[in-house]
Amino acid sequence: MQLWPHQIEALQVCARAHTQRRSRVLVQVPPGTGKTEIAARVAMSWVAERPFGRVVVCVSSAPVLEQFARRLRESTRLPIGIERAQLRAPSSARLVIATQQSLWGRLAKYPRDTLLIYDECHHGNLDAPENLRLAQSFDHVLGLSATPWSPGCEQLFAESHRVTLPLFQAEQAQLIAPHEILPWTEPAGPLALVFLASNQACEERSRKTPRSTWIGVQVPELQRRARIQHWKAGAVPILYVNRMLLEGFDEPRCPHIWLDKETDSQIQLVQMAGRALRYRPGKVARLYCATADGEEQLRAALQRCNRPQLKLV
């Protein structure tokens, strides 16, 4: 597999940083530009170069955990330990993938010299001290995010090596789709993705819209996955989504999203927009906003993806 220049740079930066006694590396790249590949290769290099080295990949959800597990199994015959709910990684596992929630109570299993790969590290927020404590428990941390702007994330990586791929450069290199921000129009498929403010709003809108479905917080996981698969298969053209759900249902063919709720969270805005930015030849991502203020908020959030903000050491 041929790597893109920003992936090569990330691997080189990590290799240099990992010669130190302690390191923080932050990789900020737009959605769909290969952060999973970066994480997998860094993990494999770490265990290959250290006879007793261990890696924990910390993820935010079960679908993302499964994505990482598939990628690592393509690269190694080493057993992959899983920390998720009732699943526990054996103490002999050198490659471990863990959900944040499960890792909280199992940190004692992992010495400080374990490499932590913190996927979607914007979750390391000061308002979520348990998430921040995860990263502070390790001497070496690689953080990956398109939006590393939460206060906790900025604190954790304030003195860090940093690799950044600006959004406009990713568009120019055809790594992500070009985008347009447009006034609201009635959602239409195929593969329409509509973000709303709550489960109730999603359920009500879906009930009024023929051939649509919805997913939300606290919807059982199996039911949620079944609905996503129906949407991907074209059985339902429109998927209404609680805006708190931002991971685990990527679909590169998704051409447009609708944002029906203003939010002050630039992290959330970029994560929602990112669902439509996956590259396909000829694709233009159209991002529809319910209000003029929402359009301006989204423009400001995406523009923030074009400038680094944290100190490089």
What are the language-model segments listed below?
Residues 52, 62-86:
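Conserved helix-turn-beta segment of the N-terminal RecA-like "Helicase ATP-binding" lobe
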Residues 1-28:
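Conserved pre-motif I regulatory segment
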Residues 122-179:
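Post-DEXD/H (motif II) to motif III coupling segment of the RecA-like Helicase ATP-binding lobe
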Residues 275-302:
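Conserved segment of the helicase C-terminal RecA-like domain
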Residues 113-114, 238-242, 247-263, 268-271, ...:
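A short beta-strand element within the Helicase C-terminal
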Residues 81-90, 212-245:
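Conserved helicase ATPase core of P-loop NTP-dependent helicases/translocases
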Residues 20-42:
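Walker A/P-loop
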Residues 55-65, 187-208:
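Conserved strand-helix element at the start of the C-terminal RecA-like helicase core
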